[in-house]
Each structure stands twice: as structure tokens, then as C-alpha cells.
Amino acid sequence: TXIVIIGGGPGGYEAA
């Protein structure tokens, strides 16, 4: 839930 963005660049982590 929610939106969590860690790194935001190549090799980063994004969960919506």
C-alpha cells in the first residue's frame, strides 16, 4: 500500500 520508491534509479526498488 502505498507507494514506496527506494533508489529511483537503475537497480532501485519500486513497489506500488
Swiss-Prot record:
It catalyses: 2 reduced [2Fe-2S]-[ferredoxin] + NAD(+) + H(+) = 2 oxidized [2Fe-2S]-[ferredoxin] + NADH. Its cofactor is FAD; Mg(2+). The keyword NAD applies. Keywords: FAD, Flavoprotein, Magnesium, NAD, Oxidoreductase. GO terms for molecular function: ferredoxin-NAD+ reductase activity. Its EC number is 1.18.1.3. Couples electron transfer from NADH to cytochrome P450(soy) in the presence of ferredoxin. This is Ferredoxin--NAD(+) reductase. It comes from Streptomyces griseus.
